[in-house]
């Protein structure tokens, strides 16, 4: 794909924000002219207020980006987090593996309910319930359970993107989804 984009005069930007969940899939070691990789150092840590990321690109691209960079691109909190990251690599890898196991269990349980699930190595599942989920999403919201609809992805209302949480949180969501969608049938 990169070659095709480069040959057409374009540049390819790869978003690896969740790459810590599937580190073998990274392309950051293959950066060359016309290929830029952006990543986050805080997604796996679940600290959304901390903006800490990186860009891997050819030296010329980095120079162009530095010309436009703001003076204070890293705040003190993000800097402190960055300083601690190397000491926690084993924990981060273990968390990613544990999350994968939770995702596999969550997907199996949803599939047993008849939901078509597309899983990957990120902490989300794409779930096709086979019918419009608009009312279910409203009922979930009323119970302070938030799920992501997929209309902004161009998918119909029968799809939801479900975050993989703890087993207890996943079980609660499945219980409510079952009650909302399958008990009445």
Task: Pin down the residues of each PLM region.
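Active-site pre-lysine segment of PLP-dependent enzymes
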Residues: 1-12, 16-47
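Residue-level detector of anion-binding/catalytic polar loops
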Residues: 11, 116, 146
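Hydrophobic residues in well-ordered beta-strands that form the structural core
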Residues: 14, 39, 74, 147-149
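PLP-dependent aminotransferase class I/II
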Residues: 35-111, 115-118
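Short acidic/glycine-enriched loop/turn segments that link adjacent beta-strands
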Residues: 49, 121-122, 154-158
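Conserved PLP-binding catalytic core of the aspartate aminotransferase-like
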Residues: 100, 112-143, 166
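PLP-dependent enzyme catalytic core of the Aspartate aminotransferase-like
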Residues: 142-143, 152-185
